[in-house]
């Protein structure tokens, strides 16, 4: 909050790197949801099951230390909460069941060092559809960094008029590999491509580069125009508060 006040006082534009807002298929999903493609959401489910920390021989680091910001909530949860707030609406009360599956890892000196940062988090919350206080959508978020052969990142939105699914099984890249499907009531899922105006002009082997470059472009435009940067500190604070609530359970 102090950073927000400082930025406003000094008329500075501040960006937060929530790069999924800049990924074409995520932007397409947002466009579809806003247009009413699934009607009013009734249930939202997000599974983000990765294997990056499943090897118990992987060394202890800041990621293993809760006080240093480690854990799956800080790594994946911050993006998950922001994505849900952007696509559906503000995050409400949060309840979580957190677990440390690998309680020790080899430290720099070779000795086993205790791990207190969660590597599994099962989270329940509500989302205010398009910010409406009279339309609360139940949401389930499952995060893991120790899921061997995990299914990757999958978002499912079930609504009054249809279903939207956005997902990727890619365990090596957090951006490449996503696909999007949509089904109207009574119809099978069909694959959806991103609209041409959402495509990246250039892509790289590391999938993170293109969306980060797009975020930087938005940031530069914010500085030129004087308009607020989104995602910025306000979005960062909202996600951080949700993460703190989940981690405190």
Task: Give, region by region, the residue ranges found by the protein language model.
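Beta-loop-alpha module in the N-terminal Rossmann-like domain of NAD(P)-dependent dehydrogenases
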Residues: 1-6, 213
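Contiguous beta-strand/loop segments that form the cofactor/metal-binding neighborhood of enzyme cores
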Residues: 81-176, 213-225, 244
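Predominantly a Rossmann-like dinucleotide-binding segment in NAD(P)-dependent oxidoreductases
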Residues: 10-15, 20-115
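Aromatic/hydrophobic pocket-lining residues that form π-stacking "cages" and hydrophobic walls in ligand
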Residues: 3, 29, 245-246
């Amino acid at each position: 909050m102090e950073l927000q006040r400082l930025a406003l006082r000094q008329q500075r534009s501040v960006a937060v790197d929530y790069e999924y807002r800049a990924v074409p298929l995520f932007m397409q999903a947002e466009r579809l949801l806003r247009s009413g493609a699934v009607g009013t959401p009734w249930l939202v489910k997000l599974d983000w099951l990765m294997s990056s920390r499943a090897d118990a021989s992987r060394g202890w680091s800041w990621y293993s230390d809760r006080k240093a910001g480690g854990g799956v909530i800080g790594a994946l949860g911050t993006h998950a909460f922001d994505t849900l707030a952007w696509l559906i609406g503000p995050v409400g009360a949060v309840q979580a069941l957190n677990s440390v599956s690998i309680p020790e890892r080899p430290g720099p000196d070779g000795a086993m060092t205790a791990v207190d940062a969660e590597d599994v988090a099962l989270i329940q919350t509500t989302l205010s559809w398009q910010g409406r206080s009279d339309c609360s959508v139940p949401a389930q978020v499952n995060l893991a960094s120790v899921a061997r052969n995990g299914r990757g990142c999958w978002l499912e939105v079930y609504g009054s008029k249809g279903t939207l699914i956005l997902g990727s099984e890619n365990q090596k890249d957090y951006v490449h590999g996503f696909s999007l499907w949509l089904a109207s009531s009574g119809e099978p899922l069909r694959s959806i491509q991103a609209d041409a105006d959402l495509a990246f002009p250039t892509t790289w082997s590391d999938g993170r580069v293109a969306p980060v470059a797009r975020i930087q472009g938005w940031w530069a435009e914010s500085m030129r125009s004087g308009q607020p940067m989104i995602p910025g500190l306000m979005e960062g604070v909202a996600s951080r508060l949700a993460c703190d609530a989940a981690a405190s359970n």
